[in-house]
Amino acid sequence: MDRRRIFKVMAATLLAVPFVNRKAAAAEGGKKAHKLAIHVDQNDADVMKLALNNTRNANELYKAAGEELAVEIVCYSQGLHMLRDDTSPVKAEIHELRKVVPQVAFGACNNTKTAMEKREGKPVPIIPEATVVPAGIVRLVELQEAGYSYVKP
């Protein structure tokens, strides 16, 4: 086979790949599932609100396209204040977001929680919408390894 023919076969193969992928997606029902991991590590109400708005906006766009979205907001370090029942500046917004995006999950870092409890000398209450995870950074790694896209507002 001469070089031109090899080149033509390679080019045709590369051009066909997107069409094969579309056919496969259509055969699976055409719904694409999206996964989003949002990282909050600052005690800043604006950053926290941005994380919630990112979640709301992504959900609206994917829902309008008929596509699914899984979201987990992981909070550690000073960002844990987002999920503290006693200090969260966005507790009401989280409650409201759960009504429109019920699939959103919130991960509260136990390492940070334990350090805050030691420093403050009292238990740190976490909002009921959140789940305590062993380590926030490890949770973010696990989510990325599971195919989640990482966003840090």
Predicted segment positions?
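Short, glycine-rich nucleotide/cofactor-binding loops
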Residues: V40-L52
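Short glycine-rich or small-residue beta-strand-to-loop segments that form or flank ligand, phosphate
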Residues: K35-Q42, V74-G79
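N-terminal export signals
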Residues: R5-A24
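Acidic helix-start/capping segments at beta-turn-to-alpha-helix junctions
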Residues: L69-L83, T112
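C-terminal segment of N-terminal export signals and the immediately downstream linker at the start
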Residues: V20-L36, N43
